């Protein structure tokens, strides 16, 4: 599934740096409304990686009712991202723990479009512990309604913080 957002009045380089800063990741977690564990950031010669565990309740506003039926009352997930230094591409992985368990992997790209940066993430979600034929519906729901929503919040925070 393709997710698109625009981050206004900035450059690709500035967005790449912003997306892996501790203050930005904390602001993202706060905006999403999750409890986050320790945010870990590592920067080597090839890429910068960031990861953080999240926990949030599913009985709150903004979580679709279908999602509430399939997800546990409290969701535990791990958010991981990597941005290469050599080009404007990155990888995202979200692992949802519990039942159903799910892994969402994504390929992200940033491109300059005039004064703005277009942020595109293509994701795929796989679940386990969900009987057929519900698995595909749950994967689509997690991909669109959970991960897609988190990515839209990420862009909103980037527009505000950037």
Predicted regions and their residues:
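Short, surface-exposed coil-to-beta transition loops
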Residues: 1-2, 74-79, 101-107
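Hydrophobic ligand-binding cavity/cleft-lining segments
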Residues: 1-60
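Short amphipathic alpha-helical segments
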Residues: 11-16, 20, 73, 138-149
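Short, solvent-exposed secondary-structure boundary motifs
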Residues: 25-34, 68-74, 96-102
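Soluble, non-transmembrane catalytic domains of enzymes that act on hydrophobic metabolites at membranes
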Residues: 36-45, 94, 107, 116, ...
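Glycine-rich portal/gate segments that line the openings of hydrophobic small-molecule binding cavities
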Residues: 39-94
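Beta-strand/loop substructures that line and gate deep hydrophobic ligand-binding cavities in soluble
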Residues: 50-51, 82-83, 88-144
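A conserved amphipathic terminal alpha-helix motif
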Residues: 77-83, 134-162
């Amino acid at each position: 599934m393709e997710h698109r957002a625009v981050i206004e009045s900035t450059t690709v380089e500035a967005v790449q740096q912003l997306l892996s800063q501790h203050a930005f990741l904390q602001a993202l977690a706060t905006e999403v409304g999750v409890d986050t564990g320790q945010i870990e950031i590592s920067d080597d010669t090839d890429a910068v990686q960031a990861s953080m565990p999240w926990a949030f309740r599913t009985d709150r506003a903004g979580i679709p009712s279908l999602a509430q039926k399939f997800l546990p009352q409290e969701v535990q997930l791990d958010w991981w991202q990597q941005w290469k230094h050599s080009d404007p591409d990155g990888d995202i992985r979200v692992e949802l723990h519990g039942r159903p368990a799910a892994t969402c992997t994504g390929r992200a790209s940033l491109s300059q479009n005039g004064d703005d940066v277009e942020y595109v993430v293509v994701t795929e979600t796989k679940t386990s512990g969900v009987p057929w034929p519900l698995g595909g519906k749950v994967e689509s729901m997690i991909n669109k309604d959970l991960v897609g929503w988190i990515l839209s919040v990420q862009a909103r925070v980037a527009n505000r913080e950037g």
